[in-house]
Each structure stands twice: as structure tokens, then as C-alpha cells.
Amino acid sequence: MINKVLHGDCLELMKDIPNGSIDMILCDLPYGTTACKWDVIIAFDKLWQQYERIIKDNGAIVLTASEPFASYLRTSNIKIYKYDWIWEKERPTNALLANKQVLKYHEMICVFYKKQSVFNPILREREEKNKRNNKARPFTSNGYVNNVPNSQGMNQTGMNDFIKPKSILKFNMERGLHPTQKPVPLFEYLIKTYTNEGDLVLDNCAGSGTTGIACINTNRNYILIEKEQKYFDIINERIGNQTS
């Protein structure tokens, strides 16, 4: 089942996934906000029954959302809900309503877990460092980054020159394959944050297969489930092109 794309109802197909075998669930669930026939909210009780069974105790369940769906989602399992990220887009998704309401430039990403999840913070250099064109490199065992040559070979930049992740993530939108398509770099960021290489990620509403592509790009394994034949075919073609 690993690195497979499954076609069918996710509530049924997830029953075949072994208990505690998934390191991360990353899914763009249907929000129930469009006229698309597939955009029907999945019964939360049945969804959480499977999610909590198959996720590891320290596995993160990371779900994109938009209001009012986001509020329904959080309260559907408030006991393991932890916090949100905000995905800030480069353009609004409700421009036609600009004369009636504020322009909407964001979606939520809700994070759930039973016990402290894997968390690999992706550090960013402070703005002043970026202005000097110093690029960050991986930390050494003593907590420093080697980046600029000096008389001894390398100059060490300390952790104070870096900023821990903020709750607002800025990624450009991607379009053309699915009405609610998410950007691959955004999902790569989330996957790298909540898993390690070789871990197994489930997306039970795979859409255009963004999670699968992000897993391939970051050396993670995946299980993708998609109910609609059209998008099931798109996923297989997309992954085939990525791995050929």
C-alpha cells in the first residue's frame, strides 16, 4: 500500500490501513463551500475514528481549512486540536465580492496530535542577515551555522541570527489541475516540519496529488486516496511524470 494511489471512498479504504502506521496525515478535506459534486463535508465522527486509529501517537494530523469549515473542524475534535498556521496567498479568492466584504487572502491549516508530534522547525535568517546576502546552512552539532570563510576556514553564525517559524506562511497559489489545488512548496514545508525522511504520509482526499509530489520531492513515502475518477487519473499521470 505504500507509495500507492487508491481509488475509492476514503472512509472504506482507510479501514485497510494498519493501526498506528501513519507518521502524518496531510489533507485538503472538502470544505462544503463550492457547487462541485465532490465538495461534501465528510462525517467527522467517522473520519476521526479512522484518523485516530491509524496515526502514530506522535504523528501530526494537518488539515487545510477555511471558515466556517475551519471552526467546525477544530471543534469536531477539540481534545487533540493544537494550533493553526495561516497560509497567506498572493491574491484574494473572493475578488468578485470586494464591494461586500473584505478580500480574503488566506486559508487556515489546522494541526492536531495526541502527543507531542515530530517538529522540525525550518529556521529563517533574520532580515538584516539577508540584506548582507548571508545564506543559511545546516546547523552543526554545537548549534552554529558555518557560512562565511574566515582566517580559520569558516565563520560561525549563532542561532540568534535565525528566527523560528512564524504562524503565517506565504506561498503563491497553483492552479490548473484542481479547483482547490494547493501549492507543492507549501506541502513540502509542512511535510518537512512534521516528518523525517522515510516517514509515511497519508492524504485521504488527494485531489490533484500535491501531497504525493511533495513526498517524492522530500524523500517521504505516501498513501493517496481519491474518490473522483478524473482526479485519480490526474494524480497517476502527475506522479508518473515526476518519477519517470
Question: Residue ranges of each PLM-predicted region?
Answer:
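Small/polar loops that bind or transfer phosphate-bearing groups
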Residues: L6, T64-A65, K227
